[in-house]
């Protein structure tokens, strides 16, 4: 088995996007609509370990129709962003945390772990050839990076694959909120659950997202933007919003307290969540990780004790929650507008990511 450092080979795309096409895309990229000229591919076999590290032209991949990923969903993924700073450097936010979470997901899905140094080097290799796809500094645009691992061995037996492929693709991403931060309305899902104790909820695994689609469609039917998941046992404790972690602000000003659902094994351990817990502490706020049930949310929002609610994740960073619907009624958080603490934390985190705030925790890693 290969135990030494991987050497990447580079095969340049002979038909890349023209400067004009790329600039047109970067002017209005949306999310997940366009892709850069190249991608990274690394193979795994039991005998050779991780090997055959390549940067190749972006394009379709070949899979045997009986590949295990297509039948039993053995796959994992991550999501992170690359930002261009004013000094020309291209950076990413806590990529080592994404590498660690990919390893954690791999353990849960019986997939061999990709070493952190290989993960980080794959980001650098892709940026080296597709640097022009990173949007200019000064705005909220970024280059979204999607690393993932799929089980490629042919076979219909239900077992872990002996062959895998790590892939890294990149897609320019526009500002999540255009024309100002917009709060979202949410539907509390009592009928469906995202994950249960002992399940795959703490892994970033496609099956979790596929299983969420019906509940998300139900939320849309109820006139809501997103679904909020409750625990699988009692259907009363708040877990996540869509694929994002939730925070509740009790009180206001310097005496405010931030509460987020504790990591129970059925929640994704969000990197943005972890970072906001640190930034809130830095700002002097009390923070607490504990269970919070729906009744407490509604009663304390009605009494004015819960003053702000927001969700957090890589794509939107922070999304304010304004209105909640459920089977027995609905309620609004405060005046339904983004809260002061919500916006202050968002400004701090995005400022660190954009290089306009001091990175006192050493979270930003240069990729070029």
UniProtKB/Swiss-Prot annotation:
Q: Which parts of the sequence carry N6-(pyridoxal phosphate)lysine?
A: 204
Q: What Pfam families does the entry give?
A: Aminotran_4 (PF01063)
Required co-factor?
Answer: pyridoxal 5'-phosphate
Q: Which residues form a coiled coil?
A: none
Is Transferase given among the entry's keywords?
Answer: yes
**GO biological process: what's one of them?**
protein-pyridoxal-5-phosphate linkage via peptidyl-N6-pyridoxal phosphate-L-lysine
Could you tell me which pathway this protein works in? Amino-acid biosynthesis; L-isoleucine biosynthesis; L-isoleucine from 2-oxobutanoate: step 4/4; Amino-acid biosynthesis; L-leucine biosynthesis; L-leucine from 3-methyl-2-oxobutanoate: step 4/4; Amino-acid biosynthesis; L-valine biosynthesis; L-valine from pyruvate: step 4/4
User: How is this protein's activity controlled?
Assistant: Inhibited by ammonium sulfate at millimolar concentrations and by O-benzylhydroxylamine (Obe).
Q: Which UniProt keywords apply?
A: Amino-acid biosynthesis, Aminotransferase, Branched-chain amino acid biosynthesis, Isopeptide bond, Pyridoxal phosphate, Transferase, Ubl conjugation
Provide the GO MF annotations for this entry: branched-chain-amino-acid transaminase activity; L-isoleucine-2-oxoglutarate transaminase activity; L-leucine-2-oxoglutarate transaminase activity; L-valine-2-oxoglutarate transaminase activity; pyridoxal phosphate binding
- Assembly information from the UniProt record: Homodimer.
Family listed: Belongs to the class-IV pyridoxal-phosphate-dependent aminotransferase family.
Entry function: Catalyzes the reversible transfers of an amino group from glutamate to the alpha-ketoacid of the respective amino acid in the final step in the biosynthesis of branchedchain amino acids. The amino acids can be ranked in the following order with respect to their efficiency as amino donor: Leu > Ile > Val.
Q: What is this protein called?
A: Branched-chain-amino-acid aminotransferase
- Which organism was this protein described from? Mycolicibacterium smegmatis (strain ATCC 700084 / mc(2)155) (Mycobacterium smegmatis)
Instruction: Please spell out the taxonomic lineage of the organism that makes this protein.
Output: Bacteria, Bacillati, Actinomycetota, Actinomycetes, Mycobacteriales
């Amino acid at each position: 088995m290969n135990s030494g450092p991987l050497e990447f080979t580079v095969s340049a795309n002979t038909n890349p996007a023209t400067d004009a096409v790329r600039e047109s895309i970067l002017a209005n990229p949306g999310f997940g609509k366009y892709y850069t000229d190249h991608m990274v591919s690394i193979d795994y076999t039991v005998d050779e370990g991780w090997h055959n590290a390549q940067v190749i032209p972006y394009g379709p991949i070949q899979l045997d129709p009986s590949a295990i990923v297509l039948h039993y969903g053995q796959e994992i993924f991550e999501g992170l962003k690359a930002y261009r700073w004013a000094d020309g450097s291209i950076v990413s936010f806590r990529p080592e945390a994404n590498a660690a979470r990919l390893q954690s997901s791999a353990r849960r899905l019986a997939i061999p772990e990709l070493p952190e140094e290989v993960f980080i080097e794959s980001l650098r290799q892709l940026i080296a050839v597709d640097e022009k796809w990173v949007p200019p500094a000064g705005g909220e645009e970024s280059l979204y990076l999607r690393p993932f691992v799929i089980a490629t061995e042919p076979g219909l037996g239900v077992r872990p694959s002996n062959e895998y492929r790590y892939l890294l693709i990149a897609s320019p991403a526009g500002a999540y909120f255009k024309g100002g931060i917009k709060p979202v309305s949410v539907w509390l899902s009592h009928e469906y659950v995202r994950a249960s104790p002992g399940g795959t909820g703490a892994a970033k695994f496609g099956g979790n997202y596929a299983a969420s689609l019906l509940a998300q469609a139900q939320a849309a039917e109820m006139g809501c933007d997103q679904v909020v998941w409750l625990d699988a046992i009692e259907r009363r404790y708040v877990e996540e919003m869509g694929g994002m972690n939730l925070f509740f602000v009790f009180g206001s000003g310097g005496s405010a307290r931030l509460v987020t659902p504790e990591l129970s094994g059925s929640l994704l351990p969000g990197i943005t969540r972890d970072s906001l817990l640190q930034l809130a502490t830095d700002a002097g706020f009390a923070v607490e990780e504990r269970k919070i049930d729906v009744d407490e949310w509604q009663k304390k929002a009605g009494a004015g004790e819960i003053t702000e609610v927001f969700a957090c994740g890589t794509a939107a960073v922070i999304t304010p929650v304004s209105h909640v619907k459920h089977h027995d009624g609905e309620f609004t958080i405060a005046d339904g507008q983004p809260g002061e603490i919500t916006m202050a934390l968002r400004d701090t985190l995005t400022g660190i990511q954009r290089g306009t705030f001091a990175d006192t925790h050493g979270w930003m890693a240069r990729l070029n």
